[in-house]
Amino acid sequence: MTAAPHILLVNPWIHDFAAYDFWAKPLGLLLLAALLRQHGCTVSYVDCLDRFHPRTPATDPQRRCGRGPYLKTRLPKPAALPDVPRRFSRYGIKPEWLREDLWSLPRPDLILVTSMMTYWYSGVQETISVLRDIFSDVPLILGGIYATLCREHARRNSGADRVVGGAAEAVLLDLVADVTGFSPAARFDPQDLDTYPHPAHDLQHRISCVPLLTAKGCPFACAYCAAKKLNPDRMTRSPEGVVDEISRWHRDFGVRDFVFYDDALLAQTEHHAVPLFERVIRHGLKIRFHTPNALHIRWITPAVARLMKRAGFETVRLGLETAGPSRWLEQEQKVTADEFQRAADSLKQAGFAKRQIGAYLLAGLPGQSFEEIATSIQIVKDNGVTPILAHYSPIPHTDLWPAAVTASRYDLAADPIFTNNAILPCRKDSFCWGTITRLKTLLAD
């Protein structure tokens, strides 16, 4: 058999008007790194978003529960967005640091680059350009969310040799064999999450938090969400496996902050979330849980809220979307004001403070009125919960995409840069700071 290859995995820069590390880690890429190590490969990891790079000022990784600002470098604004009066930046380490890090590595046999938001693709392009300068003859494969949702655009514009959509772990060993000739027998089952190794968080310079995925896929099919496209099949892990992972990172690396990346953590509550929370409680782990992806409100009962509190939940985010009528939310999935109140009351009675509970409200949907958003904000505040606006970003392959294309002042299908939620892409008129200011005033009142 061909000798085990050296594979470089890279998390690219972000190019955007604004970006902040709200527990953002390239979980999929770090899982691939773990799988490659499990099968005998040598792996190297470079994170262009590394807030703890050796060249940055020392920062406590546990500050802000693992969150924090990225290093920022001003860039020219994209020529396609002249109507947006905001500064555009590269977020992440300096280019010269990246080049130094790459020069210090042995030549890899294969490079794997991930991607996140579709409208961050210029950051992917710049990252790949630097990789090409250093390792011009090394095969480079691009995967991730942008590669999945905008595959043809990525093929034409990213600079990668190959673009892979969907769950890369299912085809990882075949890709490695095809490029390098190294073909070990699989030591995991892509359809059984309990056979996967723990993601290789130890490759990071510092571990500020550990993202957890207790299940893949979502039982819902919301019109604005791409979860079904990204992970069409629902697969769950055993509570024992999840707690073993938590215990390892807490015990061996001192990690306190754990972040659920699940699309539907509370789905099948009695068979999945409840046993998990109970096992965490029995282990007596002094840790903090955060739910930036939002919890489904209907599944939060007084009993579930009490378990969450005892298990160590610190940051609770609820997926309200809108408290008013909406043609974009299926009626059976729409949460009523009464259901929201019951969930909020359950959390508060369990001991959660107002600062710990936030409700996401979608803003900027096609045809959505300012009054609808204002009504939703007031309902959230009336229930003693913090409203958090989630500005809508149009996503290809979702049911809402055609309406977004019709509503936008941009040609969304022509360039993913136009789907950036920071530019309010579904307004027919030009970008307006007044709308943002009015919404911020409502949130603050």
Walk through the language-model features, giving the residues of each.
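Catalytic cores of alpha/beta
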Residues: 151-158, 304, 366-381
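Glycine-enriched alpha-helix->loop->beta-strand junction motifs that scaffold or abut catalytic
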Residues: 159-160, 309-315, 383-386
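Acidic, low-complexity intrinsically disordered segments
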Residues: 2-255
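Conserved beta-strand positions in the central sheet of alpha/beta enzyme cores
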Residues: 112, 164, 259, 317, ...
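Radical SAM [4Fe-4S] cluster-binding motif and immediate context
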Residues: 194-354, 358, 378
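Active-site-proximal loop/turn and secondary-structure-junction residues that shape catalytic pockets
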Residues: 117, 146, 264-266, 295-297, ...
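Residue-level recognition of beta-strand->loop/alpha-helix junctions
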Residues: 47-52, 229, 264, 319, ...
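C-terminal accessory regions of radical SAM enzymes
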Residues: 8-14, 19, 24, 46-56, ...
